[in-house]
């Protein structure tokens, strides 16, 4: 069931969070250029900040959907050590999976490039395997698509950390079909925009026009990604609330 929400409040929070992370990360890395520890610290801090902003939006979407920016940001009051711990563990697990898939995919591409004479190896290594790994990563991510909504809704639970993670996974498994449909719909839109813009650029012969089109393309794609990601989060919150109250969509 679709519910009303205040798009402008969520959009402003996303922008504020993005700018905050960008400035903070650049400040930290500027203090110690090529310093692994500082870069790691920057990633850690920006990751925590991102989680706080996303948690605020998620909590607002299940408690005060039509609230102002301040109402959404006040949702940080529901953050506690257990919520942060669970969020941190899930984020680390997803990051490890993403890194493992990226690394293995890169190795496959490298091996394929090193053996271009074998067309079957090239196709599997350079094209098929990276796509398969990406799909696996996205499938795993879908099982935890409702983690922030669950944490915001059960911030005061007496369950242990691993028990909470288990319940989040079970909910993700139960809602997998709905999550997949929403993902295909709202991730497919940016992909179609991307493909359309890329194809249109192929028709342009003038180099100056190509530069102009490229700038328009980048801006248009970023705006599309921003809007669709917000709508996708809102639709996920609808699915979560429907599941919570036993509403059949």
PLM features per residue range, with description:
Residues 6-30, 39-52, 86-101, 181-197:
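Hydrophobic alpha-helical transmembrane segments of multi-pass membrane transport/permease proteins
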Residues 10-11, 41-48, 83, 87, ...:
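Alpha-helical transmembrane segments
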Residues 11-12, 20-21, 35, 128, ...:
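Polar low-complexity intrinsically disordered regions enriched in Ser/Thr and small residues
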Residues 27-30, 45, 49-66, 136, ...:
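Juxtamembrane transition segments at transmembrane-helix termini in multipass membrane proteins
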Residues 32-42, 113-133, 207-220:
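Membrane-interface segments at the starts/ends of alpha-helical transmembrane spans
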Residues 33, 94, 106-110, 195, ...:
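Short, intrinsically disordered/low-complexity patches at protein termini
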């Amino acid at each position: 069931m679709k519910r009303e929400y205040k798009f402008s409040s969520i959009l402003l929070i996303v922008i504020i969070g993005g700018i905050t992370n960008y400035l903070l990360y650049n400040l930290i890395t500027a203090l110690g250029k090529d310093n692994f520890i500082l870069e790691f610290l920057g990633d850690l801090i920006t990751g925590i900040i991102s989680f706080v902003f996303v948690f605020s939006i998620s909590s607002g979407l299940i408690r005060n959907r039509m609230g102002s920016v301040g109402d959404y940001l006040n949702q940080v009051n529901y953050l506690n050590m257990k919520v942060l711990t669970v969020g941190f563990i899930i984020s680390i697990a997803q990051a490890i999976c993403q890194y493992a898939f990226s690394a293995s995919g890169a190795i496959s591409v490298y091996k394929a490039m090193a053996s271009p004479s074998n067309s079957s190896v090239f196709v599997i290594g350079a094209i098929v395997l990276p796509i398969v790994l990406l799909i696996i990563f996205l499938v795993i991510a879908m099982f935890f698509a409702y983690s922030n909504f669950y944490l915001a809704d059960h911030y005061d639970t007496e369950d242990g950390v691993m028990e909470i993670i288990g319940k989040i996974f079970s909910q993700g498994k139960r809602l997998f079909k709905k999550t997949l449909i929403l993902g295909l719909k709202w991730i497919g839109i940016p992909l179609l925009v991307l493909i359309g813009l890329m194809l249109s650029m192929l028709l342009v012969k003038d180099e100056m026009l190509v530069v102009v089109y490229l700038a328009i393309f980048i801006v248009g794609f970023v705006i599309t990604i921003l809007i669709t990601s917000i709508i996708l989060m809102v639709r996920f919150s609808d699915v979560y609330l429907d599941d919570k109250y036993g509403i059949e969509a």
